[in-house]
Each structure stands twice: as C-alpha cells, then as structure tokens.
C-alpha cells in the first residue's frame, strides 16, 4: 500500500483528478464476470486493450466489470464507465460518450482522453452484441 501512496503525487502532477486516482488505486471493478450476459474486447489506437463484461437483466445493467492491458488512464476511464452504467437501462448506457466519462471523473490528462474513448466504444460494442442477440 505504501507504493500505491507514492503514486498519488505522480498521478496528481500528471493531471489525474482525485476521483480518477481513487479508481486507479482501488482497482474499481477490475475483474471478470464468470458468466456475463455479454462481453466485448476492443483495442485503442495506442495499443491498450479493454474487455468489458456485463450482466443484463430485463434490459438493466446489473453488473459491470472489465479487464485490461494498458495504462492508468484506461484503468480510470474503465472503472468510471462501469460505475456509471450499473443500474442503467441498456438504452441509457448506449448514449454514454467519452466526454461523459471525462466529466464523471473530473478530468484526465489530455493525452489520456483516448482512454475514455476506448471505454465508451467498448461499451457500444458490447451493447451492439446484446441488441443483436435480443
């Protein structure tokens, strides 16, 4: 935990919001759902990879987790996304854009805005799969 605490000033200096830092340190919603309703894998232009797992019951997202290979920016954006969509209808979740994730987080460093785009496009990909199956 001491090592994690040492990361805080570095992340702050890079421009991560306090909320984003907490998501990074707590690894919020990182992991796999064993039998998700739907999942989607997507790769960003930087090479980062995100896999999103959703449990959907009666068109409501009841559980959301993700796995990733990438940077702290992706971790913050994906954690924020999963928190934002829990309890949402699939129709409302489908409307989430990268700008919504950035606002929810209180900002990411400008060079990490593409991470929010990767998170939002991975969600759209998962929901497209869901809609095609239902």
Indicate residue ranges for each PLM-predicted region:
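Domain-level signature for proteins that mediate thiol-based redox and metal-cofactor handling
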Residues: 1-134
């Amino acid at each position: 935990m001491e090592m994690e605490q040492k990361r805080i000033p570095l992340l702050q200096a890079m421009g991560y919001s306090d909320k984003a830092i907490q998501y990074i340190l707590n690894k919020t919603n990182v992991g796999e759902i064993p039998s998700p309703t739907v999942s989607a894998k997507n790769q960003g232009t930087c090479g980062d990879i995100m896999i999103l797992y959703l449990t959907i019951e009666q068109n409501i997202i009841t559980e959301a987790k993700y796995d990733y290979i990438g940077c702290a920016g992706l971790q913050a954006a994906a954690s924020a996304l999963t928190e934002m969509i829990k309890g949402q209808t699939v129709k409302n979740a489908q409307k989430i854009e990268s700008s919504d994730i950035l606002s929810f987080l209180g900002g990411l460093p400008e060079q990490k805005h593409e991470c929010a785009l990767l998170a939002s496009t991975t969600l759209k990909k998962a929901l497209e799969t869901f809609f095609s199956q239902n």
